[in-house]
Amino acid sequence: RDRSPSRGLGDVYKRQGDHGWEEVPYWLKGYGDLAYILKDSAMIAETKVWIEAAIQSRQPDGFFGPVNERGGKRELWANMVMLWCLQSYYEYSGDKRVLTLMTDYFKWQLTVPDDKFLEDYWENSRGGDNLYSVYWLYNITGEQFLLELARKLHRNTADWTNESDLPNWHNVNIAQCFREPATYYMLSGDSADLQASYRVHHLVRRIFGQVPGGMFGADENARLAYIDPRQGTETCGFVEQMASDEIMLRMTGDPFWAEHCEEVAFNSYPAAVMPDFKALRYITCPN
């Protein structure tokens, strides 16, 4: 797919494009980080085109990016991905416009009524990513309203604390969202929040994880009785699990998460991508 700035800016920032604007932030999230790590000037220049477009898309009310409404509610999931892109860019560049943009955007989020906040399936499942970005900004600016927003995000995000009745069994959501209670623990200080993330992780492996490589049998969704080696996990699930493991390690200091990340990275992920990284499998199964 052509992601050149001349085509992409028109499709993604001026119009909704093929899939809202989720696709570009997903790509940029990895591309930008690679650019900064490799210090590749051409990649950094291309990354900045998209970063500049995001910053310049800020609206008077604090919202940024294309407006994609569902039932009168603004969809927030794609913005969560773009926030991580902006955070990486700030850590590389120190560009304070990122802090201004995120501060204004989070102030806007605080004005949205609870009954119109995190209502869509994806954003409701994955509100923990938004919460993590709020912490990131708070640790730089220390603005107290961010903690109020953190509480609002937690109470409106799907409940990942109930191991007997998960909000959904989508493999990527499980890999990405099980850490939300532990993320909230950083504010609440309630050990029950921290332990909930451990319990969900172990529950899924106990029921669906009798496969090598650190993941679990799910295909698209984990289903009871479908637990043999013919069931697999999406490549997206591998990536989000590794990200969650890294974040859990950062929050807890528990080497268990480093070991689990290594298990997925070296035993599952390589089989999901071509050697040149130009193609990938949607689902990878042990057998």
What is the predicted role of each segment?
Residues 2-9, 13:
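Single conserved hydrophobic/aromatic residue that forms the stacking wall/gate
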Residues 55-63, 97-98, 141-148, 192-193, ...:
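Proline-centered turn/helix-capping motifs that create local helix->coil transitions or kinks
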Residues 140-148, 152, 166-183, 187-195, ...:
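Extended ligand-binding clefts on enzyme/binding-domain cores
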Residues 23, 65-71, 75-78, 121-130, ...:
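Short, solvent-exposed turn/loop segments enriched in Gly/Ser/Thr/Pro and often Arg
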